Amino acid sequence: LIYMLKTALCLSVFYLFYRLWLGKETFHRFNRMVLIGLILVAFVIPSLKVSQNFHLPQIEQVFERLNIPEEETEQEHDLQKMEQVTTTTLHTQLEKERSDFTILTLGNLGFLYLGGALLLLLRYIFSIACIYRLIRNSEKKCWKGKIRLVVHQQNVAPFSWRHYIVLSRQDLEEYGEEIIAHEYAHIMHKHFRDLLLAEICLLFQWFNPAMWLFRKELKTVHEFEADESVLKAGIDAKKYQLLLIQKTVGT
């Protein structure tokens, strides 16, 4: 739990750094690499151990520097020892109660943390199962080597997953070229790997808003990068912008 809290702190600081210094930059590929790098570094830093070697001077040297007589120090030591003996029972009881409370608190937090991670993992598994079912029940076409076009009869939002491009029959007939070019750009840029990394990290940092914001920023950069690739491929800019507007407003 301590490691996860340190990681959460690093992610929060790094996200603020990204938003302040790179949030408005249009170098999408660079921003993408920075986002991935910051996420990885945030998980590595808390695991680093810094060794500190402190050499305590000998007691005799301390006495010599302070010019304290040895007999006087022995008397003070005896008095301190007597005081410690009289308070040992009280301190022991307080430490035991504090230890029991700490163990109980950490145990509850641990169960809560694992419960949240488990729910998120189940959601991922359910989402993947739904994607596989959608692909299995749709028409599939080979396109550019290993790429598979998955055409569904129902009105599903276009998306790409691994080497699959999924879209509805209506989208294929109206804006097939633009949508396929956009989703193909996601596949070629290997955005799936970035999102997989973000989802795995989110399993461990589900309680941290910064990790959710990192994933959101990563998805935004992916969309900008894909749009840029589509326009470079020669797709009509006005028609593509109209498609983006329609998909944004849901018409």
Where are the regions a protein language model picked out?
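Membrane-embedded and juxtamembrane structural elements of multi-pass membrane proteins
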Residues: 1-68, 96-251
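Low-complexity, acidic polar-rich segments
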Residues: 68-99
